[in-house]
Amino acid sequence: MEIEKNYRINSLFAFYQPLLTAKQNNYMQLYYGDDYSLGEIAEEFNVSRQAVYDNLRRTEKILEDYEEKLHLYQEFTARNRQADEIQAYVATTYPHDSRLNRLVAGLENLEEQ
């Protein structure tokens, strides 16, 4: 469960990072991206562990609120699933159609940009 939560928060952070404040960005990057402990972040910014914890929880809620309103992550994962299905179908049904395979690969590459 914790791994799934961390993956989701990291994904939401990737989508909505530009909407966060510098402090929120720093704390999230250090905690989720660089695997710092609450104590290490607190020491780095000369604040209490509780302040870091509270900021992280508020920021997680903000990220979830953004996703609830904008659905960027949800739509991205849905498009990726659909693209994977199309790619698998084309690969098995039309394995020798190089143009079709290139077009499907191009769609996949657009999502990764």
Curated annotation (Swiss-Prot):
UniProt-listed Gene3D superfamilies: Winged helix-like DNA-binding domain superfamily/Winged helix DNA-binding domain
Pfam family, one: UPF0122
SUPFAM superfamilies membership: Sigma3 and sigma4 domains of RNA polymerase sigma factors
InterPro entries: RNA_pol_sigma_r3/r4-like, UPF0122, UPF0122_fam_protein, WH-like_DNA-bd_sf
Family membership noted in the UniProt record: Belongs to the UPF0122 family.
Function per UniProt: Might take part in the signal recognition particle (SRP) pathway. This is inferred from the conservation of its genetic proximity to ftsY/ffh. May be a regulatory protein.
Protein name per its UniProtKB record: UPF0122 protein LVIS_0949
Organism expressing this protein natively: Levilactobacillus brevis (strain ATCC 367 / BCRC 12310 / CIP 105137 / JCM 1170 / LMG 11437 / NCIMB 947 / NCTC 947) (Lactobacillus brevis)
